[in-house]
């Protein structure tokens, strides 16, 4: 039996709400390793970003290495949800200030999105 088969199918939501850049690097590494362990065909991953975590998407505009990691994860169908409440409260124009965030990535509430995904069977991970 392959290592990937032993884990079965998984649905996971990663929660990011800190502006600590090392946390983002670690979280991206965790997600990459998670996909590698389970197999891309066996996993659905969403990353919900709200509060101070949104500041990390500003950092990405300046860090090509992290940009490539985000791009790689998106190419593996990892979905990113960015909190509209946070964008409004911090007066952030996601089209200008955040790396690779599109209208479809915006969720009304990060916390409500986390709860919804857990109700849909996603396991919660807070790196």
Cite the ranges covered by each PLM segment:
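Secreted/extracellular ectodomain signature
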Residues: 1-127
């Amino acid at each position: 039996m392959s290592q990937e088969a032993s884990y079965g199918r998984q649905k996971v939501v990663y929660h990011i709400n800190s502006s600590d850049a090392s946390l983002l690097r670690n979280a991206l590494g965790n997600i990459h390793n998670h996909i590698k362990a389970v197999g891309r065909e066996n996993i659905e991953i969403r990353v919900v970003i709200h509060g101070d975590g949104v500041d990390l998407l500003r950092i990405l505009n300046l860090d090509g290495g992290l940009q490539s990691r985000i791009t790689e994860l998106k190419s593996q169908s990892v979905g990113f949800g960015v909190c509209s409440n946070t964008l409004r409260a911090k007066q952030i124009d996601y089209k200008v200030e955040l790396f690779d965030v599109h209208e479809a990535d915006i969720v009304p509430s990060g916390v409500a999105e986390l709860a919804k995904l857990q109700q849909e069977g996603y396991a919660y991970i807070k790196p």
